[in-house]
Curated annotation (Swiss-Prot):
Record's protein name: Plastid division protein PDV2
Superkingdom to which the source organism belongs: Eukaryota
Induction of the gene: Slightly induced by gibberellic acid (GA).
Alphabetical keyword list: Acetylation, Chloroplast, Coiled coil, Membrane, Phosphoprotein, Plastid, Plastid outer membrane, Transmembrane, Transmembrane helix
Stretches for region ARC6 binding: 235-307
Disulphide bonds in the chain: none
Source organism of the structure: Arabidopsis thaliana (Mouse-ear cress)
Length: 307
């Protein structure tokens, strides 16, 4: 339909241009006739005199204005003839497309009628049940797509030829795809069911494959985190993080130690001393004495003075 509309627009434009050129030709011919009749109002003597003067001017000028107008009108006529030829070709193309569309619709209606008649004959059959009859019923019961330029019964549209390499001989495979419509009984589900029937451990293999994928994804996430923690521990940030009570268990993914030494009630962490006040034990930080570096330490050390 879009092509027909485009052809119609082009045809209308060509007709419009042809009419405009025809108007130009008429105007030029009118101008020539006016120039020729300009001396009718003069007297016979004056007309004779003007005719003599005109002949003299024509002798001096090789091409008069009348000749120029005639040549221009002739060129316009040629252009109009070319436009008329183009217009006729466009009209023929439009008629051809309309005729093809009509014939296509007529053929599709006849195909649909024949398909319905086939279904009626299949329903009237009461004999032995054959597999080919079921396939024919399925084939005739498919929907006809009128927007896909089908000129035949609704056969499935084949995909393009496969350009992949054949696994056996290494050459390009020129065979079409084996996929067909499920309505004909040869769909992908049918092939898959046959493969599952042939393989005895189809279900368990799929589940084990899923578990392996899950474990692989978990390992990809955990291993980089373990590497970062190892680098932090090696650089000295590990004890500081443990002092602050940061949990590095990673949601239970890292293994716990089997046995951990329990801290005794009277034991304090490094850097603190046990002090008993009023019968209550406390861990306090050791006292630090600030001593100027210049008077005591010859070489400055940032770790000097730690308990």
């Amino acid at each position: 339909m879009e092509d027909e509309e485009g052809i119609g627009l082009i045809l209308a434009r060509a007709t419009e241009l042809r009419l405009k050129i025809s108007d130009c030709i008429d105007n030029s011919s009118t101008t020539v006739s006016d120039n020729g009749d300009g001396n009718e109002d003069l007297s016979p003597g004056e007309g004779r005199k003007s005719e003599i003067i005109g002949n003299q001017d024509k002798d001096f000028d090789s091409i008069s204005s009348e000749d120029v107008d005639e040549a221009e009108a002739e060129r316009l006529l040629r252009i109009r003839d070319a436009l008329e030829a183009l217009e006729s070709q466009l009209a023929s193309l439009q008629n051809l497309r309309q005729r093809q569309q009509y014939e296509k619709q007529l053929a599709l209606s006849e195909i649909d009628y024949s398909r319905k008649m086939l279904l009626e004959k299949l329903k009237e059959y009461k004999g032995k049940d054959f597999e080919v009859l079921r396939e024919t019923t399925t084939f005739a019961g498919e929907r006809v797509d009128y927007e896909n330029d089908l000129l035949l019964p609704p056969y499935p549209v084949h995909p393009p030829l496969s350009l992949g390499l054949d696994n056996n001989n290494g050459y390009l495979s020129h065979l079409p795809s084996k996929k067909k419509s499920d309505a004909n009984g040869f769909g992908s589900g049918h092939v898959r069911n046959e493969a599952e029937a042939k393989s005895p451990n189809g279900g368990s293999g799929g589940s084990s494959h899923g578990v392996i994928r899950f474990l692989g994804s978990v390992a990809k996430i955990v291993l980089p985190i373990i590497g970062v923690i190892s680098l932090l521990s090696a650089s000295g940030y590990g004890p500081e993080m443990r002092k602050r009570g940061a949990s590095l268990n990673l949601f239970g993914l890292l293994p716990h130690r089997a046995t951990r030494g329990k801290r005794t009630p009277n034991q304090c962490p490094p850097g603190k001393v046990l002090v008993i006040e009023d019968g209550e034990a406390r861990c306090l930080v050791k006292e630090r004495v600030e001593i100027p570096f210049d008077s005591v330490v010859a070489k400055r050390d940032v770790t000097y003075g730690y308990g």
